[in-house]
From Swiss-Prot:
Keywords: ATP-binding, Cytoplasm, Kinase, Metal-binding, Nucleotide biosynthesis, Nucleotide-binding, Transferase, Zinc. It comes from Lactobacillus delbrueckii subsp. bulgaricus (strain ATCC BAA-365 / Lb-18). This is Adenylate kinase. AMP binds at T32, R37, D58, L59, V60, G86, F87, P88, R89, Q93, R162, R173. GO terms for molecular function: adenylate kinase activity; ATP binding; zinc ion binding. Belongs to the adenylate kinase family. Its main location: cytoplasm. Residues 31-60 are annotated as: NMP. The lineage of its organism: Bacteria, Bacillati, Bacillota, Bacilli, Lactobacillales.
Amino acid sequence: MINLILLGLPGAGKGTASEQIVDKYHLAHISTGDMFREAMANKTPVGLEAKSYIDKGDLVPDEVTAKLVEERLGQDDVKNGFILDGFPRTTNQAELLDEITTHLNKQLTNVIAIDVKEETLIDRLSARFMCKNCGATYNKFSKKPKVEGTCDRCGGHEFYQREDDKPEVVKNRLEVNEKMNAPLKEYYDKKGLLATVNGEQAPEKVFADIDAILSKD
């Protein structure tokens, strides 16, 4: 069984790699964002508790998020293993996750960090642009519209770049994320769970490296 966390800064390719891993290994892809939305929509006790913080503009306490993760890891589709997305983000959350996985007997088997240089990430993230009409997302390098200047989805001709995709904002966002990411990598390295792959490569090569790590165990 594979119980996995992928670590990496925004733009490192975690989303693409997650999809490829789920397709091959049939793992449950557990996203904390999706969990919050689902729990709040279904008005579960933990969902309502989380909503009370979000409605006030407060951060949801780690213990509440951990309850949500524990509920989700107890569901049937997790029997083949899981890949966690968006949790843990801090060492405190990592310790809570250890308690949960030990209690459920679903201990982590792998933590894989996708490493990409800051300048590459800035290039990737600041290359994003969107259709003004329908919000479809494109990338100057990897996902251009099929017809230049025309949105594939709605046929619109006006595009814009979000404020938080501008290079100086992206750089700041990456620095904030790295401050959170570095202690997590150290935490899992000490536990002997951490492996690192080179995220500068093409997505299929990144996946091949991840696949080699997962197949080995």
